[in-house]
Amino acid sequence: MIKLRLKRYGKKRAASYRIVAMNSRDRRDGRPLEELGYYNPITDETRLHVDAIAKRLKDGAQPTDTVRRILEKASLLEPAKAKA
């Protein structure tokens, strides 16, 4: 299964992340299928390749919870409905 998830890089205690498409069984910092964007939680900077993300979602890729929140904030996904 293909997942959209975060790949960590940067210095110790100053992490940045790349949003990538990867096989769900691959290790966190392994080689991605495709890089889809960038997220820096310290400065809250986000850059997304919208076309590539839309294509991956259409093909059935599942975002992790954190990536889902980033995509909802960027209006690429509808907010998840609260469970009753």
From Swiss-Prot:
<dbReference type="GO" id="GO:0006412">
    <property type="term" value="P:translation"/>
</dbReference>
<dbReference type="InterPro" id="IPR023803">
    <property type="entry name" value="Ribosomal_bS16_dom_sf"/>
</dbReference>
<dbReference type="InterPro" id="IPR000307">
    <property type="entry name" value="Ribosomal_bS16"/>
</dbReference>
<keyword id="KW-0687">Ribonucleoprotein</keyword>
<comment type="similarity">
    <text>Belongs to the bacterial ribosomal protein bS16 family.</text>
</comment>
<dbReference type="GO" id="GO:0003735">
    <property type="term" value="F:structural constituent of ribosome"/>
</dbReference>
<dbReference type="GO" id="GO:0005737">
    <property type="term" value="C:cytoplasm"/>
</dbReference>
<protein>
    <recommendedName>
        <fullName>Small ribosomal subunit protein bS16</fullName>
    </recommendedName>
</protein>
<keyword id="KW-0689">Ribosomal protein</keyword>
<dbReference type="InterPro" id="IPR020592">
    <property type="entry name" value="Ribosomal_bS16_CS"/>
</dbReference>
<dbReference type="GO" id="GO:0015935">
    <property type="term" value="C:small ribosomal subunit"/>
</dbReference>
<dbReference type="Pfam" id="PF00886">
    <property type="entry name" value="Ribosomal_S16"/>
</dbReference>
